[in-house]
């Protein structure tokens, strides 16, 4: 550039080389590396470093950057080997273990030192001397545990410090005092404990403008975990609560099984929190010290890196004594914590404890076979849906049980497990809850709700926990007066608990004594000048308390009474306590009350002046009660004193936890001395009462019978018990005892009891006397009916289905009544009472279901419609099994009872005076099922009645024949309606009297005696009588005296009416039953064997009966003598006989299946047949009908021809040649009836064979051949159609009779017996000559 300011142009190529100039200088041979960077340091690189604040230009040759990272340096490099101008020294990711004093002396220009990610554990004081220009120091991710103020000496200009990731848990105060320029620090670690030891740091940081890094997070305690230290307040940094150590372990940590003579070392390490941290060793709770002779070597505590403390214990020669728990305990000023390990020392011959199952209130535990000396563990049963978040039920808790050296199980420890009973778990929750004045009343009301069901308590801990809560509430009575009433109610409810549970609770925790003691102290705690009187009433406890002045006291008489039961105005006082039932929630008028008057009036328990009330106990306190005050307690002005009275209905709460007579049954088998009267208490508080100059007079009413009465007072010293010292009996009557006592306290009369004391109307009390004879009559009638129908099964004309239903119904009604009378009051025995409740539950439901099933079957029969049978159509389906009825009427109650008992067997014992379901479970297990069964049954009754009514409306002429008297059968036009088909489509005669009117009988076996209307009326009567009996019986055991008597009488009426009706209807009024009874009696004379014959329904091939003469006796003479029978009293035409045959057609062959719906309505006439119980065999024979049809048809044609021939007297046929029923085709069972079958039914005339009649009661020739029991072929049907039509037009025919066995001709009866030889030879019957008679 010249003087004129000219500028030389720069070539473009030079401009491109300017940016590359620094790189070229570094790559030049003379400039690579910095001069003075020594070669001997392996892994170190040196480079120039641009000063901060310079954006361009060359590096300052005096500033050096040395990088020695990622190598294996065991210590920092010698500063003498580093360049003098080293500004940055990076030593990260090496293996440096410590920093010695003056490790960096000489690097005075060093500004940044990076020592992160090494294994530095010690930093000696003065390690950073000579680094006066150092501004950034990084010691993170090392193993530094000790940091003091000397550690950072020589760093006056340090601005940023990072010591995070080390192993220290706290910082000592003043550790940063040598860093005056420090602005940012990061010291977060995984062990950092933010407690009172770091409280100094927050104000120090504020005063020195120190910024704590946001990455400095607390690790302990757990409440401050992951919280930034900079965001905490000083008040949050405190050393309170449980001690939490970041490190605490014991080696070995698991149970060790060793042998005698082995060597076993222990090592315990924990966090070191300061000079007060110590480690101690314990064996089975006993402190251990070093003892070389015993083989115990205990080393001194060692401290590592100011962070850990370690102690070692060595057992050099293990003996049996070393078995048990070894404990390492860490003690600090803040608290103690410990770790345990179990050691089991085995002997040379070790035994085993056997496998065992233990069931208790904590669950079901199965302990396996365990080696002797070993402690076994079982996981507790957890309840994931429980609402009790208790530490004892936390997941992972276990029960433990030790097997001792002898191979015997020790008692287990189940305290960490939850209770299995819901009520016990809830009561345990109440015990754990903190109580204060703000929530005491609320908790008391909630607890009272649970004690209302105290009668169902099943665990002694229920009583223990309630007693503990009552004692806790006592401390708040002076602030909350309402607690008095709640506490008395809870104590009253607990008196309903089972006596054995009360005794167990007393033995476990003196629970009963605690309850009584709390009640005795209520008056002194609750009374004040503002509340000078308290009166509380409850079912079993009454309390009265007064605040009185001793100088104005003139005596006090108090009487405990209760309202007389409704309707017992004339009852004797002795009945009180015996008739009143134990009720969990009694009525208000049955509560105990006090009535007190001043002075000493003469009050008698027998003549209590309050209307409709009964006095139970009275006490008279003498006027000199306070005259014996000690001089120290007699100030010039007499103080106020508390006088309190209590009365307990019985002595249930007075239990001794010792082994004396207070335990049930301890005095001998069946007898013991127990409390036989109420217990009354009188006591003072706030003023001392010395020896009484006058005794206290007490009168008590007996509620239990016994002998040898004794006056006693309750002594709470020691185990507690009744003592007669100071009390004497004045007199004792059967109902009332009077006594004197020199003590203030609980007083009662003890007696030798013949049974355990029980509450009024208690367990085991009998029913009203009228119940027993009426129930006996009912059982006699029911079992007579059952036995009759079982022994005469084949001779009673009822269907198979009806037979099963009747027997089951009678049996279950008998079971209900018998169990009710015999066991409903047996509440003394828990298992028996539960069995009675289950049986009553089952039998009651089953009886109702059998009635419903019977109503359904009757409705099906009435609504049955006959199916139209086309030619070639298959026969109706076979009978359905009876098992379905048993599954409904017996299976459903069994399932309900099984589920109810499986859920909780105590659902069948409510501590009520009767054995039945608890109220709440009974709603779903009994009353709801009954509410479903009854409407369904009544609907079936209604539908059946409507079908009967519609039939009467459609057939007004037969309306008066629907409901018949017993033994009466439908005849006339009713027979015409059911006489449509005489023979079925397998080849039998289809003799149709009136086409379009006749329909076949329904495929159900009906009653051969009663019409459907009569059956329906009988079933409804039985149903409602049973309901009335059940309801009256239930009221008879649950009501009070007068309603109980009324209901007992009504029960007796209903039971007697039910039994008599069932027996009369099903046995006494049936001719077939009466005939079977007469058959059981021997004949009075030889002539008694000749019984008049009657027309019997004999089965055809298709199961339809026709009228024929029944055998007079099965013992008729086998000879073939001819005789003439006397003429019958009336004559019947063949048409009438045919009509009678069809009307009484049997439906046994149709089976027992349910009726199928069809298009036409069936006949309502009763269907009479000879042996309805063989219908299954007849039904099976249908399958062979086609194979034997031809043979059967030919035999019938022969019979027709022979019947018209005068030379064929052996065959019976009509004059027109029609064949009603061949003898060979009659059902074989028709000849096997009892003699009673030969009698005519009630209301039915005796019939004899008409001309052309082929009916016979003789057995067929070949009863075993199915071909002989088949219908005629359809060819035979065509051949005999015209003859049948002519026969139907006849009005009457003469009936020829024959005398058998020499009987005079023209007699009134005939003997139609045929010998078996004749039946086998000819298969026909003998008959007389035909007589002609005018025909219209």
Swiss-Prot record:
- Map out region (GPS) in residue numbers: 711-757
Question: PROSITE patterns per the record?
Answer: G_PROTEIN_RECEP_F2_2 (PS00650), G_PROTEIN_RECEP_F2_3 (PS50227), G_PROTEIN_RECEP_F2_4 (PS50261), GAIN_B (PS50221), IG_LIKE (PS50835), LRR (PS51450)
- Can you say where the LRR repeats lie in this chain? 85-106, 109-130, 133-154, 157-178
| Compositionally biased spans, kind Low complexity | 1084-1095, 1110-1124
Q: What induces it?
A: Up-regulated by the growth factors activin AB (INHBA: INHBB dimer) and TGFB1 in vitro.
- Tissue distribution of the protein: Abundantly expressed in the vasculature of the developing embryo. Expression in normal adult tissues is specifically vascular with endothelial expression in CNS, including brain and retina and more widespread pericyte expression in the brain and organs, including the kidney, pancreas and corpus luteum.
Q: What is this protein called?
A: Adhesion G protein-coupled receptor A2
Q: What does this protein do?
A: Endothelial receptor which functions together with RECK to enable brain endothelial cells to selectively respond to Wnt7 signals (WNT7A or WNT7B). Plays a key role in Wnt7-specific responses, such as endothelial cell sprouting and migration in the forebrain and neural tube, and establishment of the blood-brain barrier. Acts as a Wnt7-specific coactivator of canonical Wnt signaling: required to deliver RECK-bound Wnt7 to frizzled by assembling a higher-order RECK-ADGRA2-Fzd-LRP5-LRP6 complex.
Transmembrane stretches, start-end: 770-790, 806-826, 831-851, 885-905, 923-943, 1017-1037, 1045-1065
Tell me where in this chain the Ig-like domain is found: 247-344
- The chain positions of domain LRRCT read 190-241
- Any keyword Mitochondrion? no
- Annotated ranges, domain GAIN-B: 594-757
Among the record's GO biological process terms, what is one?
regulation of angiogenesis
Q: How does it assemble?
A: Interacts with RECK; the interaction is direct. Interacts (via PDZ-binding motif) with DLG1 (via PDZ domains). The cleaved extracellular subunit interacts with the integrin heterodimer ITGAV:ITGB3.
Q: Where is this motif: RGD?
A: 362-364
Major location category of this protein? membrane
Carbohydrate-modified residues are 84, 101, 162, 275, 602, 691, 735
Q: Identify the residue position(s) of the site Cleavage.
A: 369-370, 398-399
Spans within the Extracellular topological domain: 34-769, 827-830, 906-922, 1038-1044
Which family, according to UniProt? Belongs to the G-protein coupled receptor 2 family. Adhesion G-protein coupled receptor (ADGR) subfamily.
Q: What does the UniProt entry say about where the protein is found? A: Cell membrane; Cell projection, Filopodium
Q: Which GO terms describe its molecular function?
A: G protein-coupled receptor activity
Q: Which gene encodes it?
A: Adgra2
Motif PDZ-binding at which residues? 1333-1336
- Cellular component terms per the entry's GO annotation: cell surface; filopodium; intracellular membrane-bounded organelle; plasma membrane; Wnt signalosome
